[in-house]
A protein has these predicted regions:
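Polytopic transmembrane helical bundles with strong interfacial aromatic enrichment
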Residues: 2-158
Length: 158
């Protein structure tokens, strides 16, 4: 593979990785961090919609990871003798660990809490006991992704 071709493949994968991150992680963090509004109103439809968005964009974020792995395996255009990164680089495995944590919070805590809140609101009950949990989960997801971006930019140990 020629250096020019390799450079174009690298740029294409970088573009797709960033585009996927913007269009998948952005809406995920937005939905997660604002989901508690649906419980404060209370609005069952908004809670159901927030749960659906968080679930959908959590799964779509897998594309970001796949593209990142593809990008990582490319030869660095600035030094064709080495790969962009390796799985053992601290910033890579820490980012993956934090992404798994964000997925666990989103799918294991936030989505079930929003679904339960929607049922409670629909039944005429109050979801007040879940507001704090939903707000904390949304904040945690936002913080986890902010740290992932920080790791991607500064690449400590890489």
């Amino acid at each position: 593979m020629t250096a020019g071709y390799r450079h174009h493949v690298f740029k294409l994968l970088l573009f797709l990785h960033l585009l996927a991150a913007i269009f998948a992680v952005g809406p995920l963090v937005g939905a997660a961090t604002t989901a508690s509004r649906a419980l404060r109103r209370p609005d069952a439809d908004a809670a159901t919609s927030a749960a659906r968005l968080v679930r959908l964009y959590s799964y779509v974020s897998i594309v970001v990871v796949i593209l990142g792995m593809g990008l990582m395996s490319q030869k660095a255009p600035w030094d064709s003798s080495e790969e962009v990164a390796q799985i053992g680089d601290p910033w890579i495995w820490l980012s993956l660990l934090l992404w798994v944590c964000a997925m666990a919070v989103a799918l294991g805590l936030l989505v079930p809490s929003l679904t339960r809140a929607a049922v409670e609101i629909g039944g005429g009950g109050s979801p007040s006991a879940l507001v704090g949990r939903v707000a904390a989960a949304g904040g945690a997801i936002g913080l986890l992704y902010a740290v992932i971006v920080l790791l991607m930019v500064y690449q400590p140990g890489g």
